[in-house]
């Protein structure tokens, strides 16, 4: 079975010319059939993509040849099916959105802890262990005895800290996230708030699951990932989860037994939150997905994406022509 290389990458660096990087980066991704999304902002680059070994190597070489992006941190895993449908490079205000001005992990950040040393740290009764991910991610798995802030977005994390953590009481805080980038900001934020001993898992959960044997692991469950695999376990093996196409949150076999579950339309988490018009649209989409499967096609793939881009280009050309006529 064909294997796809999945590459999660990020780097905090001052990119004053980040807008200029979008076009050449997108061109390289399209030329090498790299799918996924990369975010560019003045504070750096972040994203997860997938391709063949050759495609990912071409991307990494491009990053190394771009002086400001040389040394970009990346982690690789594999997927048996294409985990992404589209190719995107987006310009953003932040590469990971916390919404707090002035947080700069390049200057202030917590202490990195290697996966091999993580168990000893979080087993210390004096260390408060905090999962910085969103609640729906934590539901699939987390470290033993870790606190769940029950946030819906990373923007809510600073409020959780203000309401629940105290630098005078919590002398040692250890935090973790999927690949490490959220902890770059969360540990920087805690340091700015006066917490002295702040630690985070280097390389995130993914690096831990890759390097720490299951028999020695303190991880319980699976790790949610933001692609078609949905979740991975020890050794980064793909887990048996699916995504609800209505709310884009993970669904379990137990969820599928619920009366509130309708394939491609609703799950227990989003049931009752969509209008009838939206539900009908979801049902029609699910119908098209199933028809595409019967034909042995992808509902949204390279050909569909290319057609969308072609139509978009034609639309822009028509608008430009109209403006020219008016001028």
Swiss-Prot record:
Catalytic reaction annotation: uridine(34) in tRNA + AH2 + O2 = 5-hydroxyuridine(34) in tRNA + A + H2O
CDD domains registered for this protein in UniProt: RHOD_YceA
Entry GO MF terms: oxidoreductase activity, acting on paired donors, with incorporation or reduction of molecular oxygen
Broadest EC class assigned to this enzyme: oxidoreductase
Domain Rhodanese stretches: 123-217
Entry annotated with the keyword Manganese: no
One GO term of the biological process aspect: tRNA modification
InterPro entries given in the database record: Rhodanese-like_dom, Rhodanese-like_dom_sf, TrhO, TRHO_N
Annotated EC: 1.14.-.-
Record carries keyword Oxidoreductase: yes
Gene3D superfamilies per UniProt: 3.30.70.100, Rhodanese-like domain
Swiss-Prot/TrEMBL keywords: Oxidoreductase, tRNA processing
Family under the similarity heading: Belongs to the TrhO family.
Function: Catalyzes oxygen-dependent 5-hydroxyuridine (ho5U) modification at position 34 in tRNAs.
HAMAP family: TrhO (MF_00469)
Protein's UniProt name: tRNA uridine(34) hydroxylase
UniProt organism field: Vibrio cholerae serotype O1 (strain ATCC 39315 / El Tor Inaba N16961)
Gene that produces this protein: trhO
